[in-house]
């Protein structure tokens, strides 16, 4: 996931020469502060904004155990919604296709200078590879950013899962709870 500083760097990057790319960047940042899956995100409308929060039922749980997810909107989300308040399309924000959205995310990351090296598994060989962050950024990076940064701030898995839509004790949720270097530093300093 990206840090809050990286998210802000992306959000503040001057993409005025590429207005369509700037729109997709804004959508990514919005997704990273509300945390929903891209499949749910594409279906959101202005009616999903209820009393200062994003409210929706996840597609993934709709058929067997539907739960309403309610994520209060922070100042970044409100800024983005204000920016697109005159958008008259059927969706909450002006999406392009998921494939083009993923490509736009990569371009926006690169133009914003989000180029740190990350280690990822090659899906074919299952061997670790080092890549630039902008090469591996996707819509799912937004969800990971939301969950990872939220967990880093509150360290309460139940509270975080209440806004991410995961069930309590979910195996899927555990993979988002990375213990980063800063958290390890805090941990060892408890012994000082």
Stretches found by the model and what they are:
Residues 1-38, 42, 99-100:
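Basic, Lys/Arg- and aromatic-enriched nucleic-acid-binding interface segment
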Residues 12-16, 47, 79, 114:
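Conserved helix-loop functional segments at active or binding sites
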Residues 9-10, 69-83, 174-192:
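DNA/chromatin major-groove-contacting recognition/catalytic segments
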Residues 16-21, 86-91, 106-162, 166:
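Short, basic (Lys/Arg/His-rich) helix/loop patches that form interaction surfaces
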Residues 43-49, 151-153, 161-168, 175-179:
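A short, basic/aromatic helix-end/turn motif that makes direct DNA contacts
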Residues 24, 67, 75, 87, ...:
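Exposed loop/turn and edge beta-strand positions of beta-sandwich/beta-sheet ligand-binding modules
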Residues 60-62, 98-101, 164-189:
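Catalytic-site neighborhood detector that most strongly recognizes the C-terminal catalytic loop/helix
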Residues 34, 43-82:
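Conserved tyrosine-mediated DNA breakage-rejoining catalytic core shared by Y-recombinases
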């Amino acid at each position: 996931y990206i840090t809050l500083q990286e998210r802000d760097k992306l959000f503040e990057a001057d993409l005025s020469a590429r207005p369509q790319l700037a729109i997709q960047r804004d959508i990514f940042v919005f997704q990273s502060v509300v945390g929903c899956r891209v499949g749910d995100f594409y279906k959101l409308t202005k009616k999903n904004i209820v009393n200062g929060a994003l409210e929706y039922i996840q597609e993934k749980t709709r058929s067997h155990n539907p739960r309403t997810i309610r994520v209060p909107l922070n100042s970044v989300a409100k800024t983005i919604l204000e920016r697109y308040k005159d958008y008259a399309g059927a969706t909450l924000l002006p999406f392009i296709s998921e494939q083009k959205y993923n490509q736009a995310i990569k371009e926006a990351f690169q133009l914003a200078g989000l180029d740190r090296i990350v280690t990822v598994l090659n899906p074919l060989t299952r061997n670790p590879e080092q890549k630039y962050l902008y090469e591996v950024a996707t819509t799912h990076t937004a969800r990971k950013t939301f969950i990872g940064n939220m967990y880093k701030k509150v360290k309460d898995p139940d509270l975080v899962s209440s806004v991410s839509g995961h069930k309590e004790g979910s195996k899927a949720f555990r993979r988002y709870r990375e213990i980063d270097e800063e958290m390890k530093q805090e941990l060892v300093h408890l012994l000082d």
